Amino acid sequence: MKYRELIQFEPINEVVKFSRLEEEDYRKGLVRNFVFSRDYEQTIIPRICENLDYTQTYRPFQKDLFSSFDTFGLQIVGNYGTGKSHLMSLVSLVAENEEYLGLISNINAKDALSAIAGKYKIIRFELGNDQELWDIICYQIDKRLKD
């Protein structure tokens, strides 16, 4: 008997292709096939959602509901192949479209992500190195507002 006969899975053998994020099937595949490690499920995803949830519906780290709470930026750092792009794709896709929650198999991650699901308009663009960051961001926002 061979391993492939015992275990059925879809291998993850590619990096996130930014150019394909407009394809619905590709998006669904990224969400459906996301591998939730214990750290992602219990710490990283809840922490990201906590910082993105401006409705204050999700505060697992806050003991007193009436105390002030500050949000802050997060920087995702890791070695090549550790899932940084997949994680950010998952978060941005769910934040943009609540329907993707149904594709998530992990109950704890689904619960955390439900706090931000469908509440954001995501603007995706690639950064070059020949312009000022401020100019690039302002141009992209202006362009999307005209759409």
Language-model features: where?
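Walker A/P-loop-proximal flanking segment of P-loop NTPase domains
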Residues: 1-82, 89, 94
